[in-house]
């Protein structure tokens, strides 16, 4: 008799979602690309499926892939085990009522059993004494519990899941149709529609006892004769959408039996060679073609044509679109021939992105530093690497201010009447007439003590009294209108003045890059310097102050280069400080903007923060939520009258309006995706494996006492912003000896 110890682990996982998502009315399409560089087995994606667990499946020319939002698991043929798939060239995917996944290949059909984590070759013999041996072109189910499979040169197969009986409709008894079925679909009445290679469109109302070609009631012609009908999908309002290689995309009204042409030629007069169709909503049809992606608004009769752009990282990765799938979050997956898979999260685009695309009418420079709106509503945008841009918020178009080619590093902007004062790095101040675009004045450092103290001007501020202050690398200047020169403020001599702000009381606040903050009290005509004191937690948190902001409640806020941000408390002449421990993602805070609801938006070195001043609650947005980049830039923000907020970063700038945000209530399912013993991944059915079935479907796990080094990989099956999901877990261990 010997003793053994068994450890039973019971695992409870709960997934929950944090975050809000929205879609702006003027919609832009930003895609996330997944390719072999991200773990995909091959870049030609022929088929896409989301299973009932929430996993995404991608069939390629070299393997089947399961994606959980963070990583891929690849399924390929392995001679060492009979549990693997028998062929790597995947052509079609379908999940049946039992949850099994049917996998079509270029040589036969396989069924993946998720609980067993294994594949089975579907080698059943049909009643007609045939079996599936050639390329599977399509798989789908009907409302009678049957799975239908289209196979090249073999017609259609129908498998009854309950009876386990296979029928083969070779179509050879219909001389007017070939056996090369490319697509098929059942309409609401149960009629089977079949698209063939070179023979057109057919339908059967009696499960292929009879078969009829589609004939247009308008001209009594076989509309799709000699065409390849490659896409068939059922739409709303009793219609079908038909895509073909020659005829583009048409809508077939099943009530009138009439065809309506939707898209046969694109905006350039080029033929649309349709590859795939997806009804994204009752009013929106997505069309995958050889020439890109077409998003067709069925209500308005208009479309958007999206193509790959080598200079645009958010564009499609390839123009040949072969597969489409809408997931349960509302996101759409686009499989391409050369570029892997692209993902468009429906609620991911409320951060509108602007970045250089290599075009003349695009943004010049991507290190966006300053925004300033002129009297015509044009937004002037200063960059640190591309000069000065003019942006029209209504048309969303750019024009480059050509003279700024001579001063590409812009640091400060201030509009004074119709003149834009431009502070530059090492090139002094340029004064631009915004009406004519002419540079009417240049101020630079000379031998005169009343010239600029330094040619690097980082901030410009006009006060309510009309005074103009300039912050430079070596001090503060006040412009003298009468003599058209500058007075140097001795209290700030030698100080790197980074920001200047006049508060509602007329006091002047200065942010310096090494000497804390200064405040000039206009009534007392005195300067006061606020510095960090490591022994005083209510002092300024850091001496490198980046910006100063006054909110609608007349509270003064300061941001710093390494101490977070703070709120000035005038009653005690102290500061309330907020840093990493308060919820900031990073202690470098660049800028603050207040929205119409009183929330403060803070740009940081690691994301965007929405801060509620009354509660201290912070919410962090990152690239996972749709930001252009996680690192923002200095003194780079602007808010329009309608509440649109512009924020600059080192990659361009974003625009958004918080009023358009809506909560995403989708709760992702949570799955254990992988199990490791002693650092090695273990699968069900392997010799010595403790797994009786797939770890994803295991509710308990029995381990021997010597199997004491193990780990799991867990995923919240969320694809819009997978890194924002949080997982709670509870371990319960039962040790049994006997």
Residue ranges with predicted function:
Residues 137, 148-154, 176-183, 188, ...:
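Solenoidal tandem-repeat scaffolds enriched in leucines and small polar residues
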Residues 55-57, 100-102, 146-148, 192-193, ...:
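Conserved beta-propeller blade signature
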Residues 62-64, 107-110, 153-156, 197-201, ...:
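Loop/turn residues immediately N-terminal
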Residues 50-53, 95-98, 141-144, 186-189, ...:
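Residue-level detector of Asp-centered blade-edge/turn motifs that repeat once per structural unit
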Residues 26-36, 71-77, 117-125, 165-169, ...:
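Trp- and S/T/G-rich repeat-edge/linker motifs of beta-rich repeat architectures
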Residues 20-52, 56, 77-90, 128-133, ...:
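Residue-level "micro-hotspots" composed of small/polar
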Residues 1-29, 48, 55, 148, ...:
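Bacterial Sec-dependent N-terminal signal peptides
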Residues 68-71, 113-117, 160-164, 205-209, ...:
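Short loop/turn segments that connect beta-strands within beta-propeller blades
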